[in-house]
Amino acid sequence: MTEKLQRILSDSKGARWTALFIVAFTMMTGYFITDVMSPLEVLLDKPIADGGLGWTSDDYGFFAGSYGLINVFLLMLFFGGIILDKMGIRFTGIMACGLMVIGVFIKYYGVTGDFGGSRFTLSFVNFSLPMSAAVASLGFAIFGVGCEICGITVSKIITKWFTGHELALAMGIQVALARLGTAGAMMGALPFAKAFGGKVGAPVLLGLVLLVIGFLSFIVYTVMDKKLDKSVEEAKGEKEFEKEKETLDEESDDDFHFRDLKYIFSNPGFWCIC
């Protein structure tokens, strides 16, 4: 049995740390995009004629809050967890990264497009936004769905590769690299924008390029993930492989069923935690 276990790919220190840094880099680019607009408010407030976007503080506040709109009101994190359990790491990760890239494309169009001073208005609630803010908010909301689902996917990936190894250290390094993305956005976004003539879109475009690289990196990871599954299957045999799915495979033995919702919502502990 020891000889078989040594053939599992996650037992290779180089392989599991490579897998970690690949997915951690993807999350780092996501965190960079999340906060890249935060230091740019001084440019957003400028009139359009002066190279800004003409946003007010209220406009920026709505944009910043849009990150969680779809996640909260459409319960996308909840459904994202279900998708992860049902469809597995590779499918969910690629889907999440794809949503992030699409969202940032829309966000970039929102802050660089010429909307001619048009506004998005909902008269029945007396709500109005510059069209640039509305489009950017839509993109940021879509990005937020992908980023949060990617986060829970990365957590499952780390558990899959590092169970029985340096699990806590791996999680700590992943969080540290993610915060490095936040620090890069906070410290570098405004100087980068000023280097390109005060254009708000410049750091967003930089983030988009980094995110695409992160997406491609995750695709590379899926190859490693498939090899890990194959190595586990070969080492354990088909019968034992089925028993290890919960921690070493993307398909958990404890698959989610919609009937489980009854037990979740009827559990007082669930509502206390909420």
Predicted regions and their residues:
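Juxtamembrane intracellular "pre-TM" segments in multi-pass secondary transporters
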Residues: T2-K13, K230-I273
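C-terminal ends and interior cores of transmembrane alpha-helices
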Residues: G98-S128
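Symmetry-related core transmembrane helices of the 12-TM Major Facilitator Superfamily/SLC fold
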Residues: G201-T222
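Cytoplasmic helix-loop-helix junction between adjacent transmembrane helices
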Residues: A133, G139-L177
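Central cavity-lining transmembrane alpha-helices of secondary-active solute carriers
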Residues: G65-I82
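Extracytoplasmic
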Residues: T18-A49, S57
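Glycine-rich segments within core transmembrane alpha-helices of 12-TM secondary carriers
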Residues: A168-K194
